Amino acid sequence: MPGVARLPLLLGLLLLPRPGRPLDLADYTYDLAEEDDSEPLNYKDPCKAAAFLGDIALDEEDLRAFQVQQAVDLRRHTARKSSIKAAVPGNTSTPSCQSTNGQPQRGACGRWRGRSRSRRAATSRPERVWPDGVIPFVIGGNFTGSQRAVFRQAMRHWEKHTCVTFLERTDEDSYIVFTYRPCGCCSYVGRRGGGPQAISIGKNCDKFGIVVHELGHVVGFWHEHTRPDRDRHVSIVRENIQPGQEYNFLKMEPQEVESLGETYDFDSIMHYARNTFSRGIFLDTIVPKYEVNGVKPPIGQRTRLSKGDIAQARKLYKCPACGETLQDSTGNFSSPEYPNGYSAHMHCVWRISVTPGEKIILNFTSLDLYRSRLCWYDYVEVRDGFWRKAPLRGRFCGSKLPEPIVSTDSRLWVEFRSSSNWVGKGFFAVYEAICGGDVKKDYGHIQSPNYPDDYRPSKVCIWRIQVSEGFHVGLTFQSFEIERHDSCAYDYLEVRDGHSESSTLIGRYCGYEKPDDIKSTSSRLWLKFVSDGSINKAGFAVNFFKEVDECSRPNRGGCEQRCLNTLGSYKCSCDPGYELAPDKRRCEAACGGFLTKLNGSITSPGWPKEYPPNKNCIWQLVAPTQYRISLQFDFFETEGNDVCKYDFVEVRSGLTADSKLHGKFCGSEKPEVITSQYNNMRVEFKSDNTVSKKGFKAHFFSDKDECSKDNGGCQQDCVNTFGSYECQCRSGFVLHDNKHDCKEAGCDHKVTSTSGTITSPNWPDKYPSKKECTWAISSTPGHRVKLTFMEMDIESQPECAYDHLEVFDGRDAKAPVLGRFCGSKKPEPVLATGSRMFLRFYSDNSVQRKGFQASHATECGGQVRADVKTKDLYSHAQFGDNNYPGGVDCEWVIVAEEGYGVELVFQTFEVEEETDCGYDYMELFDGYDSTAPRLGRYCGSGPPEEVYSAGDSVLVKFHSDDTITKKGFHLRYTSTKFQDTLHSRK
């Protein structure tokens, strides 16, 4: 295969491992056993490659191909002093590492620099092209459902526009593995062969355009800007390139790259952006040399394949001149020039691909082809699968219409060939995707119609899954997003334990949370998906497999007391008062216990003496139904501090280790009283093998919980109080007038309180996708709004281009920006210049996180502008409701425009009185600061009714001590024409 000119070879530096140390392939493999339950997978980890060529990682095979002339000691190697030469006989399959903005990452890949040369021209390597355009894939288990959906959307995008096919791997030797590695976005170029090859989708790389770009490398593309003819089309601005990254802009020699006759493509998804590896975000490193349609063409897009990308891929994989990939749930296609006959020597292929779990009905509505024995000359052929070697369902010619064809899976291959000109019509066919059906396999995938895009309205799909006798059916959800409703009345997925609609109901599911794993009691499981005619969501993706219950065997998996079956495995556990022995099967006596009294006490082992090392004690406290348990510590002393890494006490609502956590405590500070969420509580004490302390003593008591029965009648959250309860709604909802139900609130908020808390929608759960919320905060005039972040967990991106919170210094989004925030690092407090602040939160349709929690308050002082319109200024934010607080010092600078002075009119003035105004006072200065002439210090009943400045500004200072407080002051200010002299009137 000639190396396709959409990724650079980057002949920057070849970095070798230490001389004298043999290469061990085990050093460059990564175990996927924990990521994929189907089987352990080993592939070479590009982050541990044997060598690097610029930002390209090389393995042993690549090293042999490159015939390296010189080795370099890694320990002695420095980025600026190395000079290594390599012979490059051909285009090899080498990983290219790239970050979220189209730039190679400065990490394990592409971190060394130097000089190199090629002694021989690149040769054609046809083995790097995927045979028949079929690329098997595996997605590692460490990705979320939304990430998997993005990967599938990107693969379907390539399939839609080319003849490449991405197929879930079964037993193929060569395939790609989507995984998460430190290299960031990193993938091999072309087919490596001889086993799996990694495509790393690292941190912040899980965006549609970025994944499409990385799949371009898998298909066989190099970066566009390294073509030999690039200097005719773009200029490299070398003075703007980051030091040490210049080698990323080398171009390839004419004999090293094959552009397949395509012109330079500014719009290619494989092109670097204008500021790639730039010293600054606004400095260009690549600039187009000429205009296209009157403007300089944009470069570096990560939105979709360009026309040039599509044309080049179709040439590389020798796609038929006619035909296409059909992915809609219904559609039609016909022979060329239908119904006016077709030309000789035509070859067309249509690939029909619908959602896994669906089948295809293909119906020929018109057929008029040259008839021959065995349809030898002109024919249309249908195969039951994804390629030309799939099982043949029929070869047709003549004019007799075939019976409708139903696929056994979600793909059909339709091929048309002609050998002569024919005056007949040709053919016309229609197809439709049908969901549901009988699934008799031990392993497989089922997805909602049209997944990962929104499912279709008014669909009813029923799947009957059957695995081998003697096994159970296991279900694991990869992704789940179905229209939410409290009782799943509209759209839902229903799962039943059997093979019919009358079987035992396991659950009816909707919303955005993935259901727990499901296991049938027999070898059959029944699934039903229903959508109504209105709101459509992304749907679901689920894996099914045969599952055996080890705990049902006579020896209960070898467990002495309890055996807990899990999907794909099992684990042993012990009764309360016992703990697992080191062999993880036997149980031995332990501290703790199972307590059902309404009140009592618990202590650490050995109390009141020091507790022993290596103890693990669990107390399970259970009260009657409708009661809650409160735990109060009388004494507390354990090893540790805030980290609680060594010895600690952990308190949870519930009886299991994954119940709601109230707190993890250590050190010498007594925890506050803890009240359980339900009628049970779990208290766990752990000590390590080093320092021991006195431990703890605590007592517990019970109180009736009205929320435990029918949630107190509350639709969402019920909060128990001693002797009563109250209903509350989550963020994004408000309480109904009946004080029990919740109704959805708008996401545009007006906040007028002087202080409070603001959270992202659905806090503390993940915020929904495609959401935009605003908060317009207004405070008392003269007091600036201050925003302090308590928690921050928003999808991260260097420029916060995806999900983000934006803060504006004013009443709306037209005001100056104070900051745009994302990621998990808490921003510093944000302070407005005035009494208004505007917040806007935005989420896209992919990754969701917990969101943010922030408090807003006020800070006195600042600069305000006076004009002809009268404005107000108050001594404190809660003026009229409370006295001013003690211990404050505030300064306001009131500024008028040039040629105007400032007029102050006091409406209210009540400040602690003292002869010299030495305690609380207001002070006025005729200027910007306290060096200006002082107009006076006032307390008690206050200054004159009106005050005029001699200049264009007035400084107002207010001070209070920490004792007596009063009502404060309220003044109004305007701008006036300058007076000849400063004066005041009463």
Curated annotation (Swiss-Prot):
Annotated ranges, domain Peptidase M12A: 121-320
InterPro entries registered for this protein in UniProt: BMP_1/tolloid-like, CUB_dom, EGF-like_Ca-bd_dom, EGF-like_dom, EGF-type_Asp/Asn_hydroxyl_site, EGF_Ca-bd_CS, Growth_fac_rcpt_cys_sf, MetalloPept_cat_dom_sf
Biased composition (Basic residues): 112-122
Binding site for Zn(2+): 213, 217, 223
Places the protein is found: Golgi apparatus, trans-Golgi network; Secreted, Extracellular space, Extracellular matrix; Secreted
Single GO term (MF): metalloendopeptidase activity
SUPFAM superfamilies associated with the record: Growth factor receptor domain, Metalloproteases ('zincins'), catalytic domain, Spermadhesin, CUB domain
Impact noted for substituting residue 45 to H: In a breast cancer sample; somatic mutation
Cysteines paired by S-S bonds: 163-319, 183-205, 185-186, 322-348, 375-397, 435-461, 488-510, 551-563, 559-572, 574-587, 591-617, 644-666, 707-718, 714-727, 729-742, 747-773, 800-822, 860-890, 917-939
Catalytic activity: Cleavage of the C-terminal propeptide at Ala-|-Asp in type I and II procollagens and at Arg-|-Asp in type III
One GO cellular component term noted in the UniProt record for this chain: extracellular region
Single biological process term from Gene Ontology: skeletal system development
Cofactor(s) the protein needs: Zn(2+)
Cleaved signal peptide residues: 1-22
Sequence segments annotated as region (Disordered): 83-125
Subunit structure as annotated in this protein's UniProt entry: Interacts with POSTN, the interaction promotes deposition on the extracellular matrix.
Function: Metalloprotease that plays key roles in regulating the formation of the extracellular matrix (ECM) via processing of various precursor proteins into mature functional enzymes or structural proteins. Thereby participates in several developmental and physiological processes such as cartilage and bone formation, muscle growth and homeostasis, wound healing and tissue repair.
Name this protein carries in UniProt: Bone morphogenetic protein 1
Native organism: Homo sapiens
